[in-house]
A protein has these predicted regions:
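The feature marks the mature, well-folded catalytic cores of soluble enzymes
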Residues: 2-317, 352
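Ferredoxin-type iron-sulfur electron-transfer modules in oxidoreductases and energy-metabolism complexes
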Residues: 292-321, 331, 337-381
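Phosphate-binding glycine-rich loops and their immediate beta-loop-alpha structural context
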Residues: 324
Length: 381
């Protein structure tokens, strides 16, 4: 570590420490967190009691992820071959700039773009990039929609607006929609639905992440509850899926294992929707001739982002962080996160966030404060 790096770490730590103290003293954040943590723990316990076998399936999935990372080059090539065989396009992007350049060739100025939740897109700072290109960008996940308009940052891997109580959401929606919106959660959800409907139907491009990608078929797995990802990936003419290399698993069955384990640990007995996407929309209804571009997207673009993941895989200890399913359960069990929300992190949060940050995002200067905040209590395990 150089002297300059030490100086950067000191400066980053000072800013970071101030953010933590401010979060702990913010009554609004503390109210939202206490409600969310209590609700999550209650629901997760119910889900695991109903499906006790999920703990063994998690062990099985760990072996799948370990195998996948050991064979990542081979599996990534297999995904690319399968996607392109089914008339999609696939890029294995070494760095964020490669992914952004590819996306810039797909979208056009003044395009209306709808997005579903994707942490990998956050690695790219994709919204800022698209807006600089002259595009109109709509986050459609309710939590992402809220923080987009608050100009905040995600405060949880799965629930990005976890730090915003319903009263503040009502104030925000009243401002956005030009009318009084009460702090009733059911009403707030309906107002967001109404507001976003127009964007869904006008959008030229839909951008999603992926919970898993099966190499044998090139199939993208998307888990959701709101139904927005189905509209994002089904209505626009172009669909772009952005995923880290670690989302690749060998088979369709492995992808379904990800769905089952991730959704249960995310505290859902069953997700509302699971989408499997393997190609642009197609039909063979006339003379059994397959034609691409039916009711859904005419184009499918899959971007597999490396961004130092292959370097991380070479480290026998740190590569385990890439087994993470992004269910977010560890954060609710953490002794620090319920006090500070996503200020305990740099996009990727909590103890595991220190490792992911060091390799995928800000390097040591951003990772060190997160690592030193961790109490090493082990509750996240």
């Amino acid at each position: 570590v150089t002297e300059d790096t030490n100086k950067e770490i000191d400066e980053t730590f000072a800013r970071y420490q101030e953010e933590l103290w401010n979060a702990m003293e913010d009554e609004t954040i503390q109210l939202a967190l206490s409600r969310a943590v209590e609700s999550f723990r209650r629901n997760k316990d119910e889900a695991l009691k109903l499906y006790p076998q999920v703990k063994e399936k998690a062990k099985e999935l760990r072996k799948v992820k370990e195998y996948s990372l050991l064979h990542i080059d081979e599996l990534a090539k297999q995904v690319k071959d399968r996607v392109e065989d089914l008339k999609g396009q696939c890029l294995i992007a070494k760095e964020p700039k490669d992914a952004l350049k590819y996306i810039s060739e797909i979208v056009k100025e003044k395009d209306i773009i709808v997005k579903s939740k994707s942490l990998t897109c956050e690695e790219l700072h994709l919204n800022d990039y698209l807006e600089k290109l002259g595009c109109e960008v709509y986050e459609t996940d309710l939590g992402e929609f809220i923080i987009q308009h608050l100009k905040s940052r995600p405060m949880h891997i799965l629930s990005p607006a976890i730090h915003v109580p319903k009263e503040k959401v009502a104030e925000l929606f009243s401002s956005i929609m030009g009318k009084s919106v009460p702090p009733d959660i059911g009403v707030l959800v309906k107002e967001a639905r109404i507001f976003l409907r127009d964007a869904f139907f006008k959008a030229n491009v839909g951008i999603s992440g992926a919970n898993a990608i099966a190499a044998e078929t090139g199939t993208i797995f998307l888990i959701e509850n709101e139904g927005n990802a189905r509209l994002v990936t089904g209505l626009p003419r172009k669909h772009i899926a952005v995923a880290g290399l670690e989302k690749i698993v060998p088979t369709l069955q492995d992808g379904m294992l990800v769905v089952e384990v991730a959704s249960r640990y995310a505290n859902y007995k069953a997700p509302s929707y699971v989408s499997l996407i393997s190609s642009p929309s197609k039909t063979g209804d006339i003379e059994k001739q397959t034609t691409y571009g039916a009711h859904g997207p005419e184009e499918l673009h899959v971007i597999l982002l490396d961004n130092n993941r292959t370097e991380m895989i070479k480290d026998s200890t740190y590569k385990q962080a890439l087994y993470c399913l992004r269910c977010g359960a560890c954060l609710y069990e953490c002794s620090i996160y319920p006090l500070t929300a996503g200020y305990y992190g740099h996009l990727y949060m909590g103890g595991i966030g220190a490792i992911l940050t060091a390799f995928l995002l800000g390097g040591l200067e951003n990772a060190a404060p997160i690592a030193y905040t961790c109490t090493l209590c082990g509750r996240c395990k």
